[in-house]
Amino acid sequence: MQKAIPITAYKSSSLSGKIRIPGDKSISHRSLILGGLANGETYIHGLLESADVLNTASAMQAMGACIIKKDDFWIIRGTGNGCLLAAQKPLDFGNAGTGARLVMGMVGPYHMKTTFIGDASLSKRPMGRILDPLRLMGVEIEATHGDHLPLTLYGPKMANPIRYHVPIASSQVKSAILLAGLNTAGITTVIEPVLTRDHTEKMLKAFGATLEIERDKEGARLIHLYGHPHLTGQTIHIPGDPSSAAFLIIAALLVEDSDITIENVLINNSRIGLIETLWEMGAHIEFLNQRQTGGEDVADLRIKSSVLKGVTVPKERAPSMIDEYPALAVAAAFAEGKTVMLGIEELRVKESDRLSAVAQGLKINCVDCEEGQDFLVVYGKGSAKGLGGGYVSTHLDHRIAMCFLTFGLVSEKPVTIDDQRMIATSFPEFIPFIKQLGGKIA
C-alpha cells in the first residue's frame, strides 16, 4: 500500500499570472463514453488526463473501443451503438464515481454480464440511485449490501423503456438513464424537477441522438430519448473545468494583492452557482472573451483580491455548485459575517462525507461553524488573524485536500493536509499551478 504524502500551505501574497486549466471532468467522461459508442472516429482536444477520467477510458477499451493519444489530443474508434463487447474482467473505476455510474447506465441494457469494482472510497458511495431505474428496465443486479460496489449487472435480452422521475437533483442519475436508453427500444423519458448540468443532453444531440426536451405545468424538465440512434464520431474541444477553477478563484480573491486570469473556463448556466454566489459576496470576477465552443459557453476569468461579506446561499442553487461548496467554505471563513449554505445533504455521499469533513477542517483551523444534516453555517471573521495551524484529514477526498491547501495560502498560520495523492484524481496540476501563480506550498 502506498504511503500518504502530507503537504503544507503557507500564507502567501500577490498571486499573479495566466493559467489554462485542464478540461472539464464531466465532459471528459461523457466524451469518452459517447466516442466509444459512436461509429467512426472521435477526436478529443483538452481531455482531462486525471486518474478518474483515464479509468473511464480503460473501461471503454475493455468493451471494444479503440482509444489512443496522439500528440496533444485523443482519438477514439467506437464500436457503434449497441455493439459493445462483454468485458473479460471487472471494470475497475478506482475513485471515479461519475465514470462508474455513467457506464453502469450505458452497459445495463446490454445482454451480458458486467462487474464493477472501485477503491475503498468509491465502494462506500451509494449506487442504488442508478441501480433502481436499471432494475425497472429489466437489469438483474448482484450488489454488496446496500447497493454498493463491487456489483455485477446482468443485462436483459430486451430492455424496457421507462419514464422515470428523478427523486434527487442528480445529473449522474439523469445521464445514466439517458445512456441506458441508447440501447433500448422505444422512448426513454427522464423527468427532473430542477435543472442539473446538461452536458449529456447537448452531447447526445451532437453525436446524432434524437432528444426532445419540454417543461410540464409544474416546471419540471422532461427529456425524451428515442432508442437505438445511429451515433457518429465528433471532434470535441473540452473547455476548462469550473469545479477545478474554483480553488484558484478563491485563492486569488483572498490572497492579498492578487490578480490572475484563468483561460478557457466553462461557464455553462448549470455550472456557475459558485461564481454567482461570490459576486453576491462582493468578489471581483470578470468574464473576458466570452465565446461558444462545441455548444458550451466559455470565457476567460479575471480575478482580483476582494473584500467579501457573508451571504445565504439558497438550496435551489445547490445543483449548480454542488462540487464547489468546499471552496465556498474557504471564502466564507475569511469573509465578514455569517455565510449560510442550505440544501447540501448531497455532500454527505461524495468521495467522503464532504459536509462533515469541511466542518471538521474549519474547526481544526479555528473557524467557528455549525454543521446540520443538510446545511453549514460559517462565521467569518473578515480576517486571517488567528486562523490556521491545523493538520487536516482529507478522507481520501481530492476536494477536501484542495480546499484546505487553499485555506492555508490565506490563514495566518500554515495548514497541513495528511495526503496530497488523491488530488490527481481530478486536478493533477493543482499544486504546480498554485506555485506558478506565486503560492507557497511545500
Swiss-Prot record:
<feature type="binding site">
    <location>
        <position position="25"/>
    </location>
    <ligand>
        <name>phosphoenolpyruvate</name>
    </ligand>
</feature>
<dbReference type="InterPro" id="IPR013792">
    <property type="entry name" value="RNA3'P_cycl/enolpyr_Trfase_a/b"/>
</dbReference>
<dbReference type="InterPro" id="IPR006264">
    <property type="entry name" value="EPSP_synthase"/>
</dbReference>
<dbReference type="InterPro" id="IPR001986">
    <property type="entry name" value="Enolpyruvate_Tfrase_dom"/>
</dbReference>
<dbReference type="GO" id="GO:0009073">
    <property type="term" value="P:aromatic amino acid family biosynthetic process"/>
</dbReference>
<feature type="binding site">
    <location>
        <position position="399"/>
    </location>
    <ligand>
        <name>phosphoenolpyruvate</name>
    </ligand>
</feature>
<dbReference type="InterPro" id="IPR023193">
    <property type="entry name" value="EPSP_synthase_CS"/>
</dbReference>
<feature type="binding site">
    <location>
        <position position="172"/>
    </location>
    <ligand>
        <name>phosphoenolpyruvate</name>
    </ligand>
</feature>
<feature type="binding site">
    <location>
        <position position="323"/>
    </location>
    <ligand>
        <name>3-phosphoshikimate</name>
    </ligand>
</feature>
<feature type="binding site">
    <location>
        <position position="30"/>
    </location>
    <ligand>
        <name>3-phosphoshikimate</name>
    </ligand>
</feature>
<keyword id="KW-0808">Transferase</keyword>
<feature type="active site" description="Proton acceptor">
    <location>
        <position position="323"/>
    </location>
</feature>
<comment type="function">
    <text>Catalyzes the transfer of the enolpyruvyl moiety of phosphoenolpyruvate (PEP) to the 5-hydroxyl of shikimate-3-phosphate (S3P) to produce enolpyruvyl shikimate-3-phosphate and inorganic phosphate.</text>
</comment>
<keyword id="KW-0028">Amino-acid biosynthesis</keyword>
<dbReference type="Pfam" id="PF00275">
    <property type="entry name" value="EPSP_synthase"/>
</dbReference>
<feature type="binding site">
    <location>
        <position position="25"/>
    </location>
    <ligand>
        <name>3-phosphoshikimate</name>
    </ligand>
</feature>
<feature type="binding site">
    <location>
        <position position="172"/>
    </location>
    <ligand>
        <name>3-phosphoshikimate</name>
    </ligand>
</feature>
<protein>
    <recommendedName>
        <fullName>3-phosphoshikimate 1-carboxyvinyltransferase</fullName>
        <ecNumber>2.5.1.19</ecNumber>
    </recommendedName>
</protein>
<feature type="binding site">
    <location>
        <position position="125"/>
    </location>
    <ligand>
        <name>phosphoenolpyruvate</name>
    </ligand>
</feature>
<keyword id="KW-0057">Aromatic amino acid biosynthesis</keyword>
<feature type="binding site">
    <location>
        <position position="354"/>
    </location>
    <ligand>
        <name>phosphoenolpyruvate</name>
    </ligand>
</feature>
<dbReference type="GO" id="GO:0005737">
    <property type="term" value="C:cytoplasm"/>
</dbReference>
<comment type="pathway">
    <text>Metabolic intermediate biosynthesis; chorismate biosynthesis; chorismate from D-erythrose 4-phosphate and phosphoenolpyruvate: step 6/7.</text>
</comment>
<dbReference type="GO" id="GO:0008652">
    <property type="term" value="P:amino acid biosynthetic process"/>
</dbReference>
<feature type="binding site">
    <location>
        <position position="97"/>
    </location>
    <ligand>
        <name>phosphoenolpyruvate</name>
    </ligand>
</feature>
<feature type="binding site">
    <location>
        <position position="171"/>
    </location>
    <ligand>
        <name>3-phosphoshikimate</name>
    </ligand>
</feature>
<dbReference type="InterPro" id="IPR036968">
    <property type="entry name" value="Enolpyruvate_Tfrase_sf"/>
</dbReference>
<dbReference type="GO" id="GO:0003866">
    <property type="term" value="F:3-phosphoshikimate 1-carboxyvinyltransferase activity"/>
</dbReference>
<dbReference type="GO" id="GO:0009423">
    <property type="term" value="P:chorismate biosynthetic process"/>
</dbReference>
<feature type="binding site">
    <location>
        <position position="26"/>
    </location>
    <ligand>
        <name>3-phosphoshikimate</name>
    </ligand>
</feature>
<keyword id="KW-0963">Cytoplasm</keyword>
<comment type="subunit">
    <text>Monomer.</text>
</comment>
<comment type="similarity">
    <text>Belongs to the EPSP synthase family.</text>
</comment>
<feature type="binding site">
    <location>
        <position position="350"/>
    </location>
    <ligand>
        <name>3-phosphoshikimate</name>
    </ligand>
</feature>
<feature type="binding site">
    <location>
        <position position="170"/>
    </location>
    <ligand>
        <name>3-phosphoshikimate</name>
    </ligand>
</feature>
